[in-house]
Amino acid sequence: MATVNQLVRKPRSPKVIKTNVPALNACPQKRGVCTRVYTTTPKKPNSALRKVARVRLTNGFEVTSYIGGEGHNLQEHSVILIRGGRVKDLPGVRYHTVRGALDCAGVSERRQGRSKYGAKRPKS
Protein backbone atom coordinates (compact mmCIF):
# COMPACT_ATOMS: atom_id res chain seq x y z
CA MET A 1 0.00 0.00 0.00
CA ALA A 2 1.45 3.35 -1.05
CA THR A 3 1.67 6.23 1.41
CA VAL A 4 -0.17 9.51 0.79
CA ASN A 5 3.17 11.21 0.11
CA GLN A 6 4.11 8.64 -2.52
CA LEU A 7 0.72 9.09 -4.22
CA VAL A 8 1.16 12.88 -4.24
CA ARG A 9 4.55 12.49 -5.94
CA LYS A 10 3.39 9.91 -8.49
CA PRO A 11 -0.37 9.32 -8.79
CA ARG A 12 -1.83 5.96 -9.70
CA SER A 13 -2.00 5.44 -13.46
CA PRO A 14 -5.19 3.98 -14.94
CA LYS A 15 -4.98 0.58 -16.60
CA VAL A 16 -4.68 0.89 -20.37
CA ILE A 17 -6.87 -1.65 -22.16
CA LYS A 18 -5.70 -2.45 -25.69
CA THR A 19 -8.50 -3.09 -28.17
CA ASN A 20 -8.45 -5.84 -30.78
CA VAL A 21 -10.36 -3.66 -33.27
CA PRO A 22 -8.76 -0.19 -33.22
CA ALA A 23 -10.29 0.98 -36.51
CA LEU A 24 -13.84 0.82 -35.13
CA ASN A 25 -13.23 3.64 -32.61
CA ALA A 26 -15.52 1.97 -30.03
CA CYS A 27 -18.38 1.71 -32.57
CA PRO A 28 -20.24 -1.56 -33.24
CA GLN A 29 -19.84 -1.24 -37.04
CA LYS A 30 -18.21 1.10 -39.53
CA ARG A 31 -18.95 1.92 -43.17
CA GLY A 32 -16.25 1.81 -45.80
CA VAL A 33 -15.46 1.57 -49.50
CA CYS A 34 -13.72 -1.49 -50.98
CA THR A 35 -10.39 -0.54 -52.50
CA ARG A 36 -9.47 -4.10 -53.48
CA VAL A 37 -11.33 -7.43 -53.43
CA TYR A 38 -9.16 -10.54 -53.66
CA THR A 39 -8.51 -14.05 -52.34
CA THR A 40 -5.72 -15.11 -50.03
CA THR A 41 -4.45 -18.38 -48.58
CA PRO A 42 -4.66 -19.28 -44.87
CA LYS A 43 -1.90 -20.24 -42.44
CA LYS A 44 -0.12 -23.58 -42.36
CA PRO A 45 -2.41 -26.52 -41.52
CA ASN A 46 -5.34 -25.10 -43.54
CA SER A 47 -5.73 -24.74 -47.28
CA ALA A 48 -8.30 -22.63 -49.15
CA LEU A 49 -8.85 -19.42 -51.09
CA ARG A 50 -10.37 -17.05 -48.54
CA LYS A 51 -12.26 -14.04 -49.88
CA VAL A 52 -11.15 -10.73 -48.36
CA ALA A 53 -11.53 -7.04 -49.14
CA ARG A 54 -9.29 -4.09 -48.44
CA VAL A 55 -11.58 -1.36 -47.09
CA ARG A 56 -11.11 2.40 -46.66
CA LEU A 57 -13.27 3.35 -43.67
CA THR A 58 -15.11 6.64 -43.09
CA ASN A 59 -12.64 7.52 -40.32
CA GLY A 60 -9.66 7.19 -42.69
CA PHE A 61 -8.43 3.76 -41.58
CA GLU A 62 -7.60 1.18 -44.26
CA VAL A 63 -8.29 -2.37 -43.03
CA THR A 64 -8.67 -5.91 -44.37
CA SER A 65 -12.12 -7.43 -43.93
CA TYR A 66 -13.17 -11.06 -44.38
CA ILE A 67 -16.17 -11.83 -46.61
CA GLY A 68 -18.00 -14.81 -45.10
CA GLY A 69 -20.48 -17.14 -46.79
CA GLU A 70 -20.57 -18.80 -50.21
CA GLY A 71 -20.29 -16.34 -53.09
CA HIS A 72 -20.42 -12.53 -52.94
CA ASN A 73 -21.14 -9.55 -55.20
CA LEU A 74 -18.43 -7.18 -53.95
CA GLN A 75 -16.06 -5.34 -56.24
CA GLU A 76 -13.96 -2.21 -56.09
CA HIS A 77 -15.92 0.89 -54.94
CA SER A 78 -18.62 -1.23 -53.24
CA VAL A 79 -19.82 0.40 -50.00
CA ILE A 80 -19.88 -2.13 -47.16
CA LEU A 81 -20.38 -2.35 -43.41
CA ILE A 82 -17.68 -4.02 -41.30
CA ARG A 83 -17.83 -5.41 -37.78
CA GLY A 84 -15.15 -6.69 -35.44
CA GLY A 85 -14.09 -10.32 -35.33
CA ARG A 86 -10.83 -11.79 -36.52
CA VAL A 87 -10.19 -14.77 -38.78
CA LYS A 88 -7.82 -17.07 -36.95
CA ASP A 89 -6.03 -18.51 -39.98
CA LEU A 90 -5.62 -15.21 -41.89
CA PRO A 91 -2.93 -13.00 -40.33
CA GLY A 92 -3.87 -9.32 -40.27
CA VAL A 93 -7.60 -9.86 -40.88
CA ARG A 94 -9.38 -8.51 -37.78
CA TYR A 95 -12.74 -7.51 -39.27
CA HIS A 96 -15.75 -9.18 -40.89
CA THR A 97 -18.01 -7.85 -43.63
CA VAL A 98 -21.68 -7.62 -42.62
CA ARG A 99 -23.66 -9.57 -45.23
CA GLY A 100 -26.99 -8.13 -46.38
CA ALA A 101 -26.08 -4.53 -45.45
CA LEU A 102 -25.43 -1.65 -47.89
CA ASP A 103 -23.91 -2.95 -51.16
CA CYS A 104 -23.10 -6.44 -49.84
CA ALA A 105 -25.85 -8.92 -50.75
CA GLY A 106 -26.88 -11.70 -48.39
CA VAL A 107 -26.02 -15.33 -49.07
CA SER A 108 -28.61 -16.88 -51.40
CA GLU A 109 -29.98 -20.37 -50.68
CA ARG A 110 -28.95 -20.08 -47.03
CA ARG A 111 -31.21 -22.18 -44.77
CA GLN A 112 -29.53 -22.25 -41.35
CA GLY A 113 -27.77 -19.45 -39.46
CA ARG A 114 -29.45 -17.00 -41.84
CA SER A 115 -29.18 -13.94 -39.61
CA LYS A 116 -25.38 -14.06 -39.76
CA TYR A 117 -25.46 -13.98 -43.56
CA GLY A 118 -28.31 -11.55 -44.30
CA ALA A 119 -30.53 -14.24 -45.84
CA LYS A 120 -34.32 -13.85 -45.88
CA ARG A 121 -36.61 -16.59 -44.57
CA PRO A 122 -37.44 -19.02 -47.40
CA LYS A 123 -41.08 -19.41 -48.48
CA SER A 124 -41.92 -22.69 -46.65
Curated annotation (Swiss-Prot):
Keyword Ribonucleoprotein listed: yes
PTM-bearing positions, type 3-methylthioaspartic acid: D89
Superkingdom per UniProt: Bacteria
The keyword Ribosomal protein is assigned to this record: yes
Disulphide-bonded residues: none
Any Gene Ontology biological process: translation
CDD domains: Ribosomal_S12 (cd03368)
Keyword entries, A-Z: Methylation, Ribonucleoprotein, Ribosomal protein, RNA-binding, rRNA-binding, tRNA-binding
One Gene Ontology CC term in the entry: small ribosomal subunit
InterPro entries in UniProt: NA-bd_OB-fold, Ribosomal_uS12, Ribosomal_uS12_bac
SUPFAM superfamilies per the UniProt record, alphabetical: Nucleic acid-binding proteins
MF annotations from Gene Ontology: rRNA binding; structural constituent of ribosome; tRNA binding
Pfam families: Ribosom_S12_S23
Chain's role: With S4 and S5 plays an important role in translational accuracy.
PANTHER family: 30S RIBOSOMAL PROTEIN S12 FAMILY MEMBER (PTHR11652)
Assembly and binders: Part of the 30S ribosomal subunit. Contacts proteins S8 and S17. May interact with IF1 in the 30S initiation complex.
Similarity comment: family membership: Belongs to the universal ribosomal protein uS12 family.
Protein name: Small ribosomal subunit protein uS12
Originating species: Shewanella loihica (strain ATCC BAA-1088 / PV-4)
Gene from which the chain derives: rpsL
